[in-house]
């Protein structure tokens, strides 16, 4: 069983910071993945099965202008259909989604006719169940207003350790507050702190030998808050295991 993580220090009030600074912006939204969102599993953030990792069906693939090479993975956006510009909106509705995937550009199509995710467009290719909360299925694409919001998660931040004896590939999931991660450090009971780098999506890498050592992480969110997850993985951890901490970024 994973040990509880401990709070280290905070340099920003996450929810208040996001709420105070995020202004509504204009964009567009389409949908994919089928009525059960089964086609949205996996994705460029590396979250895998979105049901078991807790993200569910309120998710979206972001255009590259928003995805930011994976730095936006885990962020939450409140999306409202712009009724002033479309008859396909459902009045008085909004949905909060989590960024779990990349909507890649398609340069063979004009950005206003099929190339919805081409830069610099701010576009959300939403899981169909999420999209249908704000838009009528026949519409296909709708104009939206969106803003970044604080993420609410069940339970603590989770760490899935993959790789091999000299290569740690750690997937960080279920991040509350800002939802996204700015930087990560890793430490074994016999090592000092080592800075990790983003490998892809929400996966972070380091080259250490940490076998038979309890593992700690120092994680800084994109809102500037740092938590230390002390010995979150016990010394008998195995590759492929997921460890759940006892704290969140709020």
Swiss-Prot record:
Q: How does it sit in the membrane?
A: Peripheral membrane protein
Q: Which domain of life is it from?
A: Eukaryota
SMART domains the UniProt entry points to: DPBB_1
InterPro entries in UniProt? Expan_Lol_pI, Expansin, Expansin/allergen_DPBB_dom, Expansin_CBD, Expansin_CBD_sf, RlpA-like_DPBB, RlpA-like_sf
Q: In which tissues is it expressed?
A: Expressed in roots.
What Pfam families has UniProt attached to this entry? DPBB_1 (PF03330), Expansin_C (PF01357)
Which GO cellular component terms are attached?
Answer: extracellular region; membrane
Compartment list = Secreted, Cell wall; Membrane
Domain (Expansin-like EG45): residue spans on this chain: 42-156
Among the GO biological process terms of this entry, one is: plant-type cell wall loosening
**Residues in domain Expansin-like CBD?**
166-245
Q: Which SUPFAM superfamilies is this protein grouped with?
A: Barwin-like endoglucanases, PHL pollen allergen
In its keyword annotation, does this UniProt entry include Membrane? yes
Family membership: Belongs to the expansin family. Expansin A subfamily.
- What task does this protein carry out? May cause loosening and extension of plant cell walls by disrupting non-covalent bonding between cellulose microfibrils and matrix glucans. No enzymatic activity has been found. May be required for rapid internodal elongation in deepwater rice during submergence.
Please give the name of this protein.
Expansin-A12
Instruction: Look up and give the organism this protein is from.
Output: Oryza sativa subsp. japonica
Recorded name of the encoding gene:
EXPA12
């Amino acid at each position: 069983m994973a040990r509880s993580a401990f709070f280290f220090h905070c340099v920003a009030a996450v929810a208040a910071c996001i709420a105070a600074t995020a202004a509504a912006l204009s964009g567009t939204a389409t949908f994919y993945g089928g009525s059960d969102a089964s086609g949205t599993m996996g994705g460029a953030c590396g979250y895998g099965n979105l049901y078991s990792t807790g993200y569910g069906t309120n998710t979206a693939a972001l255009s590259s202008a928003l995805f930011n090479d994976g730095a936006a993975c885990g962020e939450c956006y409140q999306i409202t259909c712009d009724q002033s510009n479309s008859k396909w909106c459902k009045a008085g509705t909004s949905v909060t989604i989590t960024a779990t995937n990349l909507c890649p550009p398609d340069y063979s199509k004009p950005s206003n006719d099929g190339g919805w995710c081409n830069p610099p467009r701010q576009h959300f290719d939403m899981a169909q169940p999420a999209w249908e909360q704000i838009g009528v299925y026949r519409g296909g694409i709708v104009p939206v207003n969106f803003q970044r919001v604080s993420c609410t998660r069940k339970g603590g931040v989770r760490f899935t350790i993959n790789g091999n004896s000299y290569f740690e590939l750690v997937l960080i999931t279920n991040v509350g507050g800002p939802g996204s991660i700015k930087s990560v450090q890793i430490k074994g009971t016999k090592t000092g702190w080592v800075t990790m780098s983003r490998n892809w999506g929400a996966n972070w890498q380091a080259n250490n030998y940490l076998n038979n050592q309890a593992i700690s992480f120092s994680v800084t969110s994109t809102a500037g808050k740092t938590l230390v997850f002390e010995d979150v993985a016990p010394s008998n951890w195995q590759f492929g295991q997921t460890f759940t901490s006892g704290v969140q970024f709020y």
